[in-house]
A protein has these predicted regions:
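Soluble non-cytosolic domains of exported or imported proteins
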Residues: 18-26, 52-56, 116-124, 172-180
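Sec-exported extracytoplasmic/periplasmic mature domains
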Residues: 29-40, 63-67, 75, 130, ...
Length: 192
């Protein structure tokens, strides 16, 4: 499942000519196509153009549909021509979040603890993205940062392994060069 930043009511950050909402939707559609072609998975976007998204709607959608993986995409404007890729995962307190937990499928889990169930898989997936994007081939095309564990609102309440990728670009079409590296960085999906 891919969550492009923004919606009908929230245009997101200002880019060179447009806004984050439109660029992330296009970016998400290309990544969706790349993942489907390369790994044969059914990839769902959390919103369509013109749709307004309520708080925690994406978390509810991902949990009800039992998504195998959740990716939140974000784009911001930067001055440097070399794109930056930053990976985040949800983490409130490393001592508590990363501790071993036993889960009963019949127990209510609060939204701020939903990520506990798959935190080790999430961290592993984020580190996989790091190892692929720090590869010599892709290192020339982009600067990679992370993965960083922090409270990140788009990932709150999601049980499935989930990461966010934020991309810094200097021109609105620079994201097109990043589709291949990101699809390659998500190569762990072929084993899901």
């Amino acid at each position: 499942m891919i969550n492009p930043a923004g919606d009908a009511k929230n245009v997101g950050r200002k880019l060179v000519e447009g806004f984050e909402r439109g660029v992330t939707l296009q970016f998400s559609e290309e990544i969706q196509k790349g993942l489907t072609d390369k790994y044969g998975h059914r990839v769902v976007l959390t919103r369509s153009p013109g749709e307004a998204v309520l708080p925690l709607q994406n978390a509810s959608y991902a949990n009800r549909s039992k998504a195998d993986f959740f990716l939140s995409l974000h784009v911001y404007r930067q001055e440097e021509p070399k794109p930056k890729v930053i990976v985040y995962h949800l983490l409130y307190n490393p001592m508590v979040d990363l501790a071993q937990n036993n889960f009963n499928s019949f127990t209510f889990v609060p939204i701020h603890q939903a990520h506990f169930q798959n935190i080790s898989r999430t961290v592993g997936f984020a580190n996989n993205v790091k190892s692929v994007l720090n590869n010599g081939e892709f290192k020339k095309k982009l600067d990679f940062y992370g993965p960083y564990g922090l409270p990140f609102k788009p990932l709150v309440g999601i049980v499935a392994p989930s990461i966010a990728i934020e991309v810094g670009i200097c021109e609105d079409n620079n994201w097109k060069h990043l589709v291949e590296p990101i699809v390659e960085g998500l190569n762990f999906l072929e084993n899901l």
